[in-house]
Curated annotation (Swiss-Prot):
This is Histidinol dehydrogenase. The gene is hisD. One of its GO terms (molecular function) is NAD binding. NCBIfam families: hisD (TIGR00069). It catalyses: L-histidinol + 2 NAD(+) + H2O = L-histidine + 2 NADH + 3 H(+). It holds the Pfam family Histidinol_dh. GO terms for biological process: L-histidine biosynthetic process. Binds 1 zinc ion per subunit. The active site is at residues 350-351. Gene3D superfamilies: 1.20.5.1300, Nitrogenase molybdenum iron protein domain (3.40.50.1980). Substrate binds at residues 259, 281, 284, 351, 384, 438, 443. InterPro entries: Ald_DH/histidinol_DH (IPR016161), Histidinol_DH_CS (IPR001692), Histidinol_DH_monofunct (IPR022695), Hstdl_DH (IPR012131).
Amino acid sequence: MLRWGVMSENIMRIIDLRGQNLSRAELLAAMPRAAMGTSEATDLVRPILDDVKERGAAALRDFEEKFDHVRPKNLRVPVEAIKDALTTLDPEVRAAIEESVRRARAVAANQVPKDFYTDLAEGARVAERWIPIQRVGLYVPGGKAVYPSSVIMNAVPAQAAGVESLAIATPPARDNEEGLPNKTILATCAILGVDEVYAVGGAQAIAMFAYGAKGSEPQDGDILCDPVDKITGPGNIFVATAKSLVSAFVGIDAVAGPTEIGIIADETANPSLLAADLIGQAEHDELAGSVLFTDSTEIADKVQESLKYRVPRTEHAERVHTSLSGTQSAIVLTDGLDQSIDAANAYAAEHLEIQTKDADAVVKRIKNAGAIFRGPYSPVPLGDYMSGSNHVLPTGGTARFAAGLGVHTFMKPVEVIEYDEEGLKALAARINAFAVSEDLPAHGECVLSRFVKDPYDKATLREQEKEAGLR
């Protein structure tokens, strides 16, 4: 056990990139990452998915008893329990949640994409409509902490997108004899107006959303839960594996790994604040990644000293120490700001803080990050709770090609092709030529049939095209 006092040894390892002209592949390989084996998780999760698919609510109750050590009487939380949770919510916590919701809704309202159209010629238009996904399942994890903030981050953009049907699954609280979820989570659902909530966690919750679940007891009804079109929300490796396994036939936001922070800092940064920010992320999980990129050995040394003082004094000291001393965390020493930026882009952090003299200039050069936190007064916990931004972000380097959760996550763009007779007529001969070149003549014949008498008479086709005004 870690106790009050000052630690003697440095906590974080050093990765020294100075004096090295690394290729892109070498830079990617040098970044600190935890080894994430998924084969064992897959072997454990697949039978859970199959059992829920087959037995529905009966399997869900069995798995809740096995994994969460409680057998919920009502897998679907009664609406009265959701309302009651709000009446007993601490007023200060309620005010914080409501402010978070207000800010998240303001940002989400501006994220709603607009339909548009392009006129290419007379009678030739292509439009794009953004259509909300009809039914979405939102997963809110339990485990080491309670996450009402995850309810907000998932539900608010879905509501802004216009999703018709929202369902939330979250594990039952182990200290609740009835098997109800945490009351703060239920109260947050009440504030957001979400009343379809299930006391189901883990891989079994993902299975319920993906396949739906038939009832097994009278209170369940014939159908406990209808299948959804998309599943969003963070979770542990078993939740992530389950999402991956069902993603062939139901949409998912991402396969999320452990949370992570990257910080670019120069000699102007405050080392005590840097240490506090690294600790704040490490608090999430023993596998959480915390990485500092700096060209200042003085800053690196002072951060190590601050960590020695701070880590033993934080409540979850053992968890934090395990995370910061793990292979997924490091202080990366660079030759200068340019190399720090290159390394940060290679790392592609879920959260990237910029604590440098000219933060705006650095922000403009960031290509890969789930979210960017500019300056010392924009720490990651601000984004976790209250900034208005979304905290469901790509992890494990996937910010190189993926984005965080937003209104767009819950919508799909659909193109509408609107050509009239003259618009198609102007292209008919060219479409036919294109189709023939790909050995798909029926494609061309389909178009020509609208203008010529016999598109199959190749001997007279060119003449027919001329008579029809296609040439």
